[in-house]
């Protein structure tokens, strides 16, 4: 009986992990940059503590020595990306998500297991995207949230950002604001799975930060929010009924 229970637990965990995912690749104006400017997470597990520094970019880089640090749950990324991706103000980047690290096929959902929820993208102006720790303010440039499919449909039939990712082989286009000031930015891609968000701490955040350099543009420098701090575990939309 004990071994049966253990096997059942392992099976349940495996099924749960299948639904997890990470943003991994970036396209710039239709050109595949692969993962060259992505701070790749070390696993496809989500962040669930909105008060943790992991809510920034899955982890943060210490300002003194740029060493990889993790939160108490062990959430981490591999640190600074290999390079920065250059994109013109007004250009289009395409974020790309898949369930397993290194995966790029379209044979499985980008994020499975009925992990329905919004997809949002933030940017943060920084001095150097390769060393920024994510403590600077972030402003939102994109969101793909919820839409009712029909008056007779059930909740699982509704439109969600994560469903759009699944429909498009994990890809989603995001326009960089045309008047944005030139310079280095962290581009923070986030999908929030709400299937377990009936109580505080149940929402699952799948986050990757990309290191980009914006060229051209103007002088726009939007006000933003801080992570952690922007979300509270009991906020409507983070906790759902």
Predicted segment positions?
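Peripheral, solvent-exposed domain-edge segments
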Residues: 2-119, 125-171, 194-241
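Surface-exposed loop/turn positions
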Residues: 91, 183-184
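Short acidic/polar micro-motifs centered on Gly/Asp/Asn
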Residues: 175-176, 193
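A short tyrosine-centered beta-strand micro-motif
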Residues: 185-189
């Amino acid at each position: 009986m004990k071994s049966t229970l253990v096997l059942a637990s392992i099976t349940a965990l495996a099924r749960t992990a299948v639904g997890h995912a990470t943003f991994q690749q970036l396209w710039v104006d239709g050109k595949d940059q692969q993962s060259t400017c992505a701070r790749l997470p070390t696993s496809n597990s989500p962040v669930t503590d909105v008060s943790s520094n992991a809510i920034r970019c899955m982890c943060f880089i210490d300002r003194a020595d740029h060493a990889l640090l993790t939160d108490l749950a062990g959430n981490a990324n591999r640190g600074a990306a290999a390079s920065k991706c250059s994109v013109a103000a007004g250009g289009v980047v395409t974020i790309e998500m898949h369930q397993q690290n290194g995966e790029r096929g379209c044979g499985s959902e980008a994020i499975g297991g009925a992990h329905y929820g919004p997809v949002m993208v933030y940017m943060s102006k920084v001095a150097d995207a390769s060393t920024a720790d994510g403590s600077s303010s972030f402003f939102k440039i994109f969101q793909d949230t919820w839409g009712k499919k029909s008056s007779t449909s059930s909740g699982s039939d509704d439109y969600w950002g994560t469903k759009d990712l699944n429909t498009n082989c994990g890809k989603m286009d995001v326009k960089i604001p045309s008047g944005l000031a030139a310079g280095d930015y962290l581009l923070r891609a986030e999908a929030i799975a709400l299937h377990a968000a009936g109580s505080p701490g149940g929402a699952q955040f799948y986050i990757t930060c990309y290191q980009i350099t914006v060229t051209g543009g103007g002088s726009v420098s939007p006000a933003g929010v801080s992570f952690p701090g922007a979300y509270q575990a009991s906020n409507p939309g983070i906790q759902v009924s």
